[in-house]
Amino acid sequence: MAENLDISELSPIHPAIISRQATINIGTIGHVAHGKSTVVKAISGVHTVRFKNELERNITIKLGYANAKIYKCSNEECPRPGCYRSYSSNKEDHPPCEICNSPMNLVRHVSFVDCPGHDILMATMLNGAAVMDAALLLIAGNESCPQPQTSEHLAAIEIMQLKHIIILQNKVDLIRESAAEEHYQSILKFIKGTVAENSPIVPISAQLKYNIDAILEYIVKKIPIPVRDFTTAPRLIVIRSFDVNKPGAEVDDLKGGVAGGSILTGVLRLNDEIEIRPGIVTKDDDGRIRCQPIFSRIISLFAEHNDLKIAVPGGLIGVGTTVDPTLCRADRLVGQVLGSKGNLPEVYTELEINYFLLRRLLGVKSGDKNTTKVQKLAKNEVLMVNIGSTSTGGRVMMVKADMAKILLTAPACTEIGEKVALSRRIEKHWRLIGWAKVVEGKTLKV
């Protein structure tokens, strides 16, 4: 069905595509233990899925990606929001409605990026490795609002310029109606003047699955279909890679390495010629860094349990290649960029960046004002630079008011205008101190 589709006519809600893979990414954010993962479970049912196959399991669990199909009942009389239902991504396209038994239509296939602890979250959000189109902000009704991380996450969303947010007031089953009303007022006060100001606020109980159908209706109605350009050169950021061969397999049965990641732009098809950059990085006799891109061909594509003929941006995609499996084993390719041959951006060893520092450290509570303030960049200090899904060290060579020159410890495939996150080592932890835009850099001859 998908082979003879015309790429220019595809859209992220084309039935042939959403029946097999997710096309919209939604992040779940909020304070610790406010129920982010529980909401994802309530919508996608994913914690109950025992994957048929280790492959997908490796990919989806570590990062907390879960896909869900959202259906709407075809019967006009069926009362909303009960006419919306969600199932896991291997459900058929027209299941019967549980209320009136009419067939339901698949309207969206979404992928939830379930963000873990906030420090990591900040880096992933800024990295754009989680290409989020929208966010669910969770606020628990049985604690006062705002909790410290709730406000940081809002700051992070503002940096990322995410416009579409749905606020979920969780755990309403634990509080009285009057308390819920007061808490609702405190949420309104908290979001005033931020990006989330006019966002809908839905009272829910993720454990009891109360009002989950209302969230689905908002996801379908409030979150616009992201504009995706399927005609540009494809690019995928690798976040997992592995060797799928069992020890002792026959030589003829060996399979190539598998890379998993999210596609940023374009479309990947079976049998495409691809290139992976920076590839194999070595040093020559003079100590200069060389890199050798890896060339290969796509032999399989899959999303959760579904084999694909073509893969579009959204959710996590596994790409089976002809690459030597030892190059892929145990996440060796993480942070590399995969794309069509000859169309990938340059590999840089030095970056000139235009940087912005946060006013104070996030997530550090301390009585002393000075410790939480972010100090200016110093010459020769070593920062951690997150580019896409690569984390590499960077030594600050030169600093001006808002510009800095950074020498990377490992070459990175990036392009001018890309956003990177900067972290500094504070009390034995890497802490996010700001973000930057790549202005120019020194490229490696590949």
From Swiss-Prot:
Q: Which biological process annotations from GO are given for this protein? A: formation of translation preinitiation complex
Positions of the UniProt region annotated as G5: 205-207
Q: Which GO terms describe its cellular component?
A: cytoplasm; cytosol; eukaryotic translation initiation factor 2 complex
Source domain of life is: Eukaryota
**Compartments in which it is found:** Cytoplasm, Cytosol
Gene3D superfamilies xref list: P-loop containing nucleotide triphosphate hydrolases, Translation factors
Where GTP binds, per the record, is at 33-38, 170-173, 205-207
UniProt region (G3), positions on chain: 114-117
Residues in domain tr-type G?
A: 21-227
The UniProt GO MF terms for this protein read:
GTP binding; GTPase activity; methionyl-initiator methionine tRNA binding; translation initiation factor activity
Q: Which InterPro entries match?
A: EFTu-like_2, eIF2G, eIF2g_C, eIF2g_dom_2, eIF2g_GTP-bd, P-loop_NTPase, T_Tr_GTP-bd_dom, Transl_B-barrel_sf
**What EC numbers are recorded for this enzyme?**
3.6.5.3
Keyword Mitochondrion listed: no
Q: Which reaction does it catalyse?
A: GTP + H2O = GDP + phosphate + H(+)
The residue stretches assigned to a coiled coil in this entry are none
* Region of interest (G2), ranges: 58-62
Q: Where is this region: G4?
A: 170-173
Please give the residue ranges the record annotates as the region G1: 30-37
| UniProt keyword annotations, A-Z | Cytoplasm, GTP-binding, Hydrolase, Initiation factor, Nucleotide-binding, Protein biosynthesis
Looking at the record, which segments are called Interacts with cdc123? 436-446
Subunit structure and binding partners: Eukaryotic translation initiation factor 2 eIF2 is a heterotrimeric complex composed of an alpha, a beta and a gamma subunit. The factors eIF-1, eIF-2, eIF-3, TIF5/eIF-5 and methionyl-tRNAi form a multifactor complex (MFC) that may bind to the 40S ribosome. Interacts with cdc123; the interaction is direct.
Q: Which family does it belong to?
A: Belongs to the TRAFAC class translation factor GTPase superfamily. Classic translation factor GTPase family. EIF2G subfamily.
Q: What does this protein do?
A: As a subunit of eukaryotic initiation factor 2 eIF2, involved in the early steps of protein synthesis. In the presence of GTP, eIF-2 forms a ternary complex with initiator tRNA Met-tRNAi and then recruits the 40S ribosomal complex and initiation factors eIF-1, eIF-1A and eIF-3 to form the 43S pre-initiation complex (43S PIC), a step that determines the rate of protein translation. The 43S PIC binds to mRNA and scans downstream to the initiation codon, where it forms a 48S initiation complex by codon-anticodon base pairing.
Q: What is this protein called?
A: Eukaryotic translation initiation factor 2 subunit gamma
Species name for this entry? Schizosaccharomyces pombe (strain 972 / ATCC 24843)
